[in-house]
Amino acid sequence: MPSQTPIITLTPELQVQLKEHTEGLLNNIIHTNLRTRFVQEFDGLRKFRDAFELLKDHSAHETWECYRDSVPLTNYSTYEPFISRFLAEPCREDDVKDILSPGLPFFIAKSSGTSGKAAKLFPKYRHFIGTAPSRNPTAAKGCHILSMTYLQVIDVLRNEGNSTKVVVTASSSGTVRMQHDLTIEKDAEVIKMTLPNTTSPIAVGHIRNYRSFLLMHALFALAEENLTFFYATYSTLFLDLIMFMEEEWATLLNSIENGIIPDFEDMHHVREYLEPKLLPNLSRAQKLREIGESKGESGWLFKIWPELQQVKCIVSGLFATTIPKIRHYLGPEVLINSRGMGASEGYIGESCSFTDLNLFKLATKEFIEYLDIMKDPSPANLVPAWEVETGRRYEVFLTTRDGLWRYRLEDIIEVAGFDSGDGIPLLRYVERLK
């Protein structure tokens, strides 16, 4: 969040600070991915390769100038011939190692196809922060609506004769797996566990039936009176959970009273792992029955969970239409917080305000450039973070740790100002490129 009141224009000192930071970020990304297959084989980077070899000291500023003048714009079709190597049968390590970033990806993110377009695949690699921070085991619990399912498992054959498994899954699921080092090889053991400070056992995340998946998250959340947060990818996911919970209210309360997992669809493969996790709780069930008399009223969820502090999910863009309904369910006491602005390709901005849910502070893990929407898409028209102007709208281009170079994201943002502490731009999501 902004350290102080946002400013409209960067001071000279903050502009220099932001420039040095951003150039350093780009320098690290380029030096990390310089020897990858994509950089060495993609003909569009030939000019960059030749120019980079002639640099004297490869300083951050020198690297930025080389990149600025020689790297073309790219889109998904640029990477598809390289990413498609993961789909070959057999998939051999020699063919896919160091494709976009060093080593093998931890998982491959599959974007959801929109506007009739086919879904896209993006290899995701483990970087310096590979595991999630430890949590206080005595802290209050929350419901993290998380799926652990995957769409495909790719067996990458190693030269030694063994293989490594790489899952194709949603970016949210893959990221949590990567943060907690939950490789698919560990699933048989991990499925018996519950992550720290979360209400739902990991086995719930292995339910593929959408309704059953959300109902089981609801069941374990209802059983926890001292619930403090809900985390969901999208606001619609949270609202669907509440809707299904209302529909199956009596069944869920009977399960809590008797400690019995309900017989919802497509749960046979996880039932044995869930049954030991739900203990009979007559008093909780009775209290919920009393609360159920006001089901659907404003603030109803706060009556169920009087310790609830926030619901965190994507509520910007098209999802902003869900905010009034969420606020009705929560009442005035509970905060609604945005999860940030991002895509399968990369993370753009961090949540910046509890009152303005479409305000984000530029994330500092990827190098982001901006194209004024009134200008033609060309490398010469891109500007870096230290040259954007408040009030202007830009199309976003990403150069990422996972190996994308000036990738056209087709998202439009508006610059809302700058953090007065470090000069980082503040952004608002506007729309997809039409």
Model feature map: region roles:
Residues L100, P123-F128, T138-A139, I191, ...:
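Beta-propeller domains
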Residues N75, Y79, G103-L104, F128-T131, ...:
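Phosphate/oxyanion-binding active-site loops and adjacent basic polyanion-contact surfaces
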Residues M1-L55, S59, Y67, R92-E93, ...:
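Active-site glycine/GP-rich loop and adjacent strand/helix microenvironment
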Residues G24-N28, F38-I108, K120, G130-A132, ...:
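Active-site diphosphate/adenylate-binding microenvironment
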